[in-house]
Design a protein with these regions (language model features):
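Conserved catalytic core of nucleotide polymerization and phosphodiester-bond processing enzymes
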Residues: 1-177
Length: 177
């Protein structure tokens, strides 16, 4: 979809679908991002979720590969690797080693049951209420954490590479020079 082309009116809908569905979101995520306010109906939402997932098989496979790696690392206390991302359990912590070598850390992870009756991972951290609590997660959410962290690492690399420039600031993934 071209930004100012014939079908540019579809751009915002596509952007919402990417942001809502890219990390495992479904109908609820689409609604919370304003899909119904953009003219989509309730009946449009599940087919949109299904179509997005069918159109992005490598992303959805990556979600569940990460999910399996996290769960087996926690339950079997073994190291795992998925596409250059390493998972290890040590001293009551789940560590995810990024390609940069930086570690993401999850405190006291364990396997529990989610609200849908399926298996999920929980760990301790600061939740939405700003209090220390158990936080539920799963493959797509871990992928979101990994992608955001790798993006930060790339931005930092770019900032070091451009150290000869006067960097005024940065917003999301853009540097202001």
């Amino acid at each position: 979809v071209e930004k100012h082309g014939i079908n540019s009116h579809l751009r915002q809908k596509g952007k919402i679908a990417e942001l809502a569905l890219g990390y495992g979101g479904s109908i609820g995520a689409l609604k919370s991002m304003g899909a119904l306010d953009m003219g989509l109906t309730e009946d449009d939402l599940q087919p949109l979720v299904d179509a997005w997932r069918m159109s992005n098989p490598f992303i959805t496979k990556f979600w569940w590969d990460i999910d399996r790696a996290v769960k087996s690392t926690i339950t079997q206390r073994i190291q795992n690797e998925v596409r250059g991302i390493n998972f290890m359990y040590k001293s009551g912590m789940l560590f995810i080693r990024l390609p940069s070598g930086r570690l993401l850390s999850y405190v006291k992870p364990k396997i529990g049951e989610n609200k849908f009756g399926g298996e999920s991972v929980t760990y301790e951290g600061i939740g939405a209420t700003k209090k220390w609590e158990r936080i539920e997660s799963y493959g797509p959410k871990f992928v979101e954490n990994i992608v955001q962290a790798v993006s930060r690492d790339i931005l930092c690399y770019a900032m070091r590479t451009l150290s000869h420039c006067f960097i005024v600031g940065h917003v999301h993934d853009e540097l202001i020079i």
